[in-house]
């Protein structure tokens, strides 16, 4: 929880003198079921963040890769997002496209763990793919591996993926004239300085926050004068 939310909860608890006499509100309007409409809004929002749509339209189909949801939810929204963006030349790891909380094909469903990518890499070697992408079971983390010149695959660390993404985003924004003068990237305090050094070379500052997407997204309130890129 972000600070304001924590304060609100603490203040509410401070006003309770007897937990056994708390009035229970049975008004179910506080419960909102998230349905397909939210998925559609999310996919629509994704269309707005492609920094170089012309490049994607031209080259997206030529990128051949393998995707694994590691027995999780990523396949549902992931495939729609990929196809919508123009990345359609991919293969799904069928054995790992079945939702299963026991994660039968991996010891740990961590996409940054090389062992978790073994099946996807085998698919990539068989199909001649250039890269492998995997998401963790609840699809809020990812891992990747890329084909090297000798045909082997190198599993990238989270810091390496971040550095590649930052360099691409800032380069693309610079080339398209959309890099703001007061730009900033947001990283967590456990990240390496690799991405920050790249940002610095573009004249972009770095905001370090606590781990978790809630902390990253919270910067739109804490850094109102900085445009996050």
Task: Go through each PLM region and give its residues.
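Short Gly/Thr/Asp-enriched flexible loops that form oxyanion-binding sites at enzyme active sites
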Residues: 140-158
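Glycine-rich phosphate-binding loop plus the immediately following alpha-helix
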Residues: 1-19, 158-182, 187-195
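Conserved small/polar residues in nucleotide/adenosyl-binding loops
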Residues: 219-225
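Gly/Ser/Thr-enriched, mixed-charge loops and adjacent short helices
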Residues: 1-116, 124
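Glycine-rich active-site loop/lid that clamps phosphate-bearing ligands
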Residues: 198-218
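Phosphate/diphosphate-binding loops
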Residues: 111-134, 193, 208-214
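Short acidic, glycine/serine/threonine-rich loops at helix termini
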Residues: 76-81, 102-105, 142-148, 168, ...
